[in-house]
Amino acid sequence: MQADEISSIIKERIDNFELDVNVAETGKVMAFADGVAKVYGLKNVMSYEMVEFDTGDRGLASNLEESSVGVVVLGAGKNIKEGTSVKRLGKLMKVPAGDALMGRVVNGMGEPVDGKGAIETTEYRFVEEKAPGIMQRKSVHEPLQTGLKAIDALVPIGRGQRELIIGDRQTGKTTVAIDTIINQKGQDVVCIYVAIGQKESTVAQVVRKLEEHGAMEYTIIVNAPASDSAAMQFLAPYTGVTMGEYFRDNARHALIIYDDLSKHAVAYREMSLILRRPPGREAFPGDVFYLHSRLLERAAKVSDELGAGSLTALPIIETQAGDVAAYIPTNVISITDGQIFLETDLFNSGVRPAINVGLSVSRVGGAAQIKATKQVAGTLRLDLAQYRELQAFAQFASDLDESSRKQLERGQRMVEILKQPPYAPLPIERQVVVIFAGAKGYMDDISVTKITKFEAELYPFIEAKYPQIFEDIRTKKMIDKETEETLSKALEEFKTVFVA
């Protein structure tokens, strides 16, 4: 081999030489217990930055102290021990978003847990995102129908609203949420159901119900079950809302349900106490209000300049023995735009959905209600309140005057009309027709026990003989003189058939 050949080979080698060095800031675990690692080093780590242990586990830098960092481990972290090496990843947490997630079940970090393979998406978004400001928003003005008569007529929800569902355990809170998801079929609304600290079997049941009704194809489920670490339960709602924001920011509509935020607060309390943050009322940390406010403020109706998309939130809170004045319930009530209050007594007496009409309000939904519903249900709230008052009075007074007795009987029928079986949401035009029938006295002489049968037979009758009524309410979104006359005629005709 010639000398010049050798020198050219050496030159080529030098030219092609790449120094492949990875520079990463590292630290060492000083102590690890209850899913939290105390790490020495990582001087320049950011708050909530992702870090990686050499065991492969990942964590979030939560407490930034002078000489150490409190890292919340995501997952079990079984192999982490004192002396384990930790390195900064230099990035904040991101989760997948987009249409590829529909029909899937993911964990608190957005990883699939349904055995249907990887999620094919290129869209990743930051979990912690600032909520839209005042100028980026628009007031709530389009209805988001739940398919439940008691809600759509009395506590209407609009797109971009936050409406709290609150009640004791076993009062049908999740059922209201599932009904709302089922009712979004064909409405072009993407639904996200976040299960926090639930039993795996309960979540499996929810998935099965949604599949039965063909609702899973437009639904994403984020599941952080009771067996998951507190950190995963804390993360799940933020993961869910990040997925929802993708649709909101792309001029589409989404609905997110947090089931439930009581367990979310408990998971955060557990995390904070392990991180040795000072406890406050009910041992919750001082920033538990901010925990929920920064989450719920991300639900919004976005301005026309930004595409007029929306993200509607239905947080659920579980109360203890009806105590709405506890810390977390009052916090969330003050953050949301109204609440649907479910009562054990009503549930047990057969009024389902067990909505207490007196305590439930919707602070912005009225602007989103369609005119037809306003026309038939305008005085319904007041009538029901007067009925409740009369009912209490009638227990003691035996002799009631004629008008009071009529009011009582009408009230009983209205309560009966507002009852509804689970997982059977009603289209708005049917709701309008049946509430019209009740409010205008077409059911006054029908026995209370036959109201359900009356309602069940009324829809097919109108569908067969007067289909124009449903069509008009659907398209005009109001009852004009002509529709009212046709509807009155149809009800008179149906009543003679029904009574006979």
Swiss-Prot record:
This is ATP synthase subunit alpha. Belongs to the ATPase alpha/beta chains family. It comes from the Bacteria. GO terms for cellular component: plasma membrane; proton-transporting ATP synthase complex. ATP binds at residues 167-174. It is found in: Cell inner membrane. Keywords: ATP synthesis, ATP-binding, Cell inner membrane, Cell membrane, CF(1), Hydrogen ion transport, Ion transport, Membrane, Nucleotide-binding, Translocase, Transport. Its EC number is 7.1.2.2. The lineage of its organism: Bacteria, Pseudomonadati, Campylobacterota, Epsilonproteobacteria, Campylobacterales. SUPFAM superfamilies: C-terminal domain of alpha and beta subunits of F1 ATP synthase (SSF47917), N-terminal domain of alpha and beta subunits of F1 ATP synthase (SSF50615), P-loop containing nucleoside triphosphate hydrolases (SSF52540). It is an enzyme of class 7 (translocase). F-type ATPases have 2 components, CF(1) - the catalytic core - and CF(0) - the membrane proton channel. CF(1) has five subunits: alpha(3), beta(3), gamma(1), delta(1), epsilon(1). CF(0) has three main subunits: a(1), b(2) and c(9-12). The alpha and beta chains form an alternating ring which encloses part of the gamma chain. CF(1) is attached to CF(0) by a central stalk formed by the gamma and epsilon chains, while a peripheral stalk is formed by the delta and b chains. Transmembrane segments: none annotated. GO terms for molecular function: ADP binding; ATP binding; proton-transporting ATP synthase activity, rotational mechanism. Coiled coil: none annotated. It is a peripheral membrane protein. It catalyses: ATP + H2O + 4 H(+)(in) = ADP + phosphate + 5 H(+)(out). The record marks 360 as: Required for activity. Produces ATP from ADP in the presence of a proton gradient across the membrane. The alpha chain is a regulatory subunit. It comes from Wolinella succinogenes (strain ATCC 29543 / DSM 1740 / CCUG 13145 / JCM 31913 / LMG 7466 / NCTC 11488 / FDC 602W) (Vibrio succinogenes). InterPro entries: ATP_synth_asu-like_sf, ATP_synth_asu_C, ATP_synth_asu_C_sf, ATP_synth_F1_a_nt-bd_dom, ATP_synth_F1_asu, ATPase_a/bsu_AS, ATPase_F1/V1/A1_a/bsu_N, ATPase_F1/V1/A1_a/bsu_N_sf.
